[in-house]
Amino acid sequence: GAEYCPYCALERYPLVLALSRFGTFTGLQSTNSDPADNAGVPIYTLGFHGSTYTSKYVSFSGYETVDNTKVNGVYGKLDTLPDADQALLDKYNKPPYVDPPGGAIPWIYFGGKGIMNGAGVDKALLEGKAISDIATSIADPTSEVSKAVVGDANLLTAQICVMTNNQPAEVCGSSGVKAAAAKLGQ
C-alpha cells in the first residue's frame, strides 16, 4: 500500500482487526491519506511503516511504499519491498488476478491461497473522522462503520483461515468468519 492512498487507508482497519485475531502488532502509527487524492478529505488511519507483527499462525509484512505528502509533485519513499515480495506483486497484481489493468493498491497476497485488492469499506463511512471516533464506531456492533469494518475483517480472517488450516479454531470457527468463508471465491 501507500500512505497517500484512500483505499489503503480504508482497508487497514479491517486488516489490522483480522490479523489481530491471530497475533499482535507493535509500532502501528497513526497516519492519513492525502486529502488531495480524495476530494480534499483525508481518511485517518493506521500505518504499517515501522510496525512489526508476530503470530504463531501466520506471517505478515505490511509495506507502505510512499508517504502522504508530495514534494515537487512526488510522494516520499518509505518501504522498499524485498525482491521476493516485489516478484509476487509484479506477477499477481495484474489481470487475470486483479481487475484494474495497471494493478491496484491495497493489494494483499495470502501465501499462495488467495489475493485481494481494493477496499471492502465504503469511504463515505470514514472520511474525515478521527481514529478515536472510528474505533468507537467499530466497537459498536450496531453502527454502520462496525458492520462494514468487521464484515470486511471477517472476509480477510476467512482467507487467513484457509492458510492456517482453520487455526485457531475459536477464530476460524466463529459464526461471522464461517459466514464470510462461504462468500470466498464468489
Regions found by a protein language model. Name each.
Residues 7:
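Cell wall/extracellular polymer interaction/catalysis modules
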